[in-house]
């Protein structure tokens, strides 16, 4: 593969230079700070999926004043057909100057739930 100047581009050099190509960090534990509902100024692009067992998952993105590198993706679940929902968990918050947006949930035919997003 070659870059614009016909210079060979390897996977390694691409990963070193483009923050968006680095895998997102997994986050566990309780949410605090900017992730807490009272500190979120907006949220958008919800996606919903249902598992074989009936559990609903919804995800959406938020963070910062609008679209930008402060964006992250949150995930909630419901076991009563959406009457009540869990507190959100942080699913995606890329490091560096990378925006996470447009999340999409999908339940595969084998029952696994996938979360896709753009960054």
Model-predicted segments: where are they?
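Asp-box/BNR beta-propeller blade signature and adjacent active/binding-site loops
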Residues: 3-119
């Amino acid at each position: 593969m070659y870059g614009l100047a016909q210079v060979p581009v390897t996977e390694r050099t691409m990963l070193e230079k483009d923050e968006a190509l680095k895998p997102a960090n997994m986050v566990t534990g309780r949410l605090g700070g900017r992730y807490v509902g009272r500190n979120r100024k907006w949220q958008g692009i919800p996606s919903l999926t249902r598992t074989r067992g009936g559990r609903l998952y919804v995800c959406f993105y938020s963070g910062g004043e609008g679209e930008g590198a402060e964006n992250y993706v949150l995930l909630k679940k419901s076991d009563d057909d959406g009457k009540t929902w869990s507190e959100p968990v942080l699913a995606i918050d890329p490091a560096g100057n990378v925006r996470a947006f447009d999340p999409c949930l999908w339940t595969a035919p084998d029952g696994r739930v996938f979360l896709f997003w753009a960054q």
